[in-house]
Amino acid sequence: MKLLFEGLLVLVLIAFVVAEFESDAEKWEALITQERACKGEGVKGCYYEADDWCCKKTPCKCPAWSHERECRCTQPCNPSCRGKRALMVDPETHRMLSLHRLSEE
């Protein structure tokens, strides 16, 4: 009886992990394909700290489900920002997107 219960518990855990992974994959897909305009588009750049985001006075967009801090530039960085190209998203999301893209290839 105990073995049956443990087996059932393992199956439930596996089902939960698979469902969670599919949910994350949908979020990554939304990040890649669905964008909306940022607040203040074309005024301050992609976030409150325009210099840090290397996007001064250029239009920017955000993933559909995100906050402004995850904006991306729609035009190349200002020439004075060369070598400091803006991260499109926070480092952890950027890492996950890279892994997601590699897994599709």
Swiss-Prot record:
UniProt domain comment? The presence of a 'disulfide through disulfide knot' structurally defines this protein as a knottin.
Q: Where in the cell is it found?
A: Secreted
Keywords, A to Z? Amidation, Cleavage on pair of basic residues, Disulfide bond, Ion channel impairing toxin, Knottin, Neurotoxin, Secreted, Signal, Toxin
Q: Which residues form the propeptide?
A: 20-36, 86-105
Please name the GO terms that the record assigns under molecular function. ion channel regulator activity; toxin activity
Q: Which residues form a coiled coil?
A: none
Q: What does this protein do?
A: Toxin active against insects (S.frugiperda larvae). May act on sodium (Nav) or calcium (Cav) channels.
Q: What is this protein called?
A: U1-sicaritoxin-Li1b
What GO cellular component entries does it have? extracellular region
